[in-house]
Amino acid sequence: MTTTIRPKDRDSVLQSLRAGVVPRAGQHLIQVGRTREIETLVNDIDRIADGGSGFRVVIGEYGAGKTFFLNLVRAVAMERKLVVASADLNPDRRLHASGGQARSLYAELMRNLSTRTKPEGGALAGIVEKFIATAKADAKAQGLATEAIIRERLSHLTELVNGYDFADVIAAYCRGFEEGNEELKANAIRWLRGEYSTKTDARQALGVRSIVDDASIYDQLKLLSRFVRLAGFSGLLVSLDELVNLYKLANTQARNSNYEQILRILNDSLQGSAEGLGFVLGGTPEFLLDPRRGLYSYPALQSRLSQNSFATGELVDFSGPVVRLSSLTPEDFYVLLQKIRGVFALGDESKHLVPDQGIFSFMEHCSKRIGDAYFRTPRTTITSFINLLAILEQNPGTAWQELLGGVEVLADTGGNADLAVDGEDGDEFASFKM
């Protein structure tokens, strides 16, 4: 590796991998394979930036690299001037609910709202201020009031659900901006983040009659996608991971309500009615294929998401909504370990702590311990390799051959939890006894 790597990027990548989590930055330093899949998502991003829409379900076994892939797509989208909202689903965050779980998902998306200049989240206020700053400049040039320009620019949002109130909230933020009223600005951001739980509180604070509730989160995302384009960005990409949590819902009605929301998003995307808005969803094969609990249990989704019957054997088709991630091969994993070695050395080949033969020997050692799992679900294997490099770095003169036999490699069994089903409300026959 000849590219010099900044210590900040090195530490970010290595600390994340050592802890068994996916790095939020620097993914390009350790990316291997998946060229066609990445090209497919980049084409989606370009289409969204051109005012179109996108919808992809990224499917892969536990440990196949879904989260890494989604984070890589997220980074590419921000480089292309898209705003990215990302969140993991869990029992308290869903696409559809009646107990606040959907609003909780929306609030998490807004907390994680990211741009190229603010990649770690919390970008909502900056986006609003960028829109207002542009409006103020135009208002000054035309000799008009800033609020009049804002109202004019947001006028076409009023055709959407909550559009009038959205415009009122942006205007309220502008007043707070001009008057130095921090409380008014904070209240406007609270509304935009979906943090008001009652309409009464929102009306008292901002004079608006609606709030972001469980039923309106998708409509609010459509509003936001148009707004970020008015603020000078290319569009909005919504990245949702851990959709297996919908598969794990025990209550059939709750599951189907969430799948119905996914169908609505998919239909809008296919019909082109969502402007500058894209969705990328990450899940396991069970979440997609299970005929009783997965997306395929919902007939309308099965017909839209089914695989091209001609894509068999080595033939692939990336034009459909589903992108299937295959597991890494031993060759891919070898390249990955080489890249990790390079990151550890800050890109300086003269500082590599193990030679290529050492990587081969490490892979053979892992294969003897846990078989194919060492490259198919490589989380624990990567952690062990980084631990080995850390010992070699901090103990100069130690031979890697002496340490190899003592390297502990365990199979990654975290995927077993994905098949467990929540006992929330119970299925129809959950307690049936003979």
Can you describe what each PLM-predicted range is?
Residues A172-R190, T312-V316, S326-M434:
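C-terminal alpha-helical "lid" subdomain
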Residues I38, L70, A102-Y106, R255, ...:
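Amphipathic alpha-helical segments in well-structured domains
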Residues Y62-T67, V244-N245, T377:
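Gly/Ser/Thr-rich loops at beta-strand to alpha-helix junctions
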Residues V57-G60, A64, F68-A231, E393-G397, ...:
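P-loop NTPase nucleotide-binding core
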Residues F68, A135-D138, L246, V409-A417:
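Eukaryote-specific, cytoplasm-facing alpha-helical/coiled-coil scaffolding segments in long proteins
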Residues M1-G54, T398-M434:
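A short, basic N-terminal segment
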Residues T4, K8-D9, K185-V238, E242-V354:
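The catalytic "switch" region of P-loop NTPases
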Residues Q31-T35, G63, G99, G121, ...:
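Conserved phosphate/pyrophosphate-binding and hydrolysis machinery centered on Walker-type P-loop NTPases
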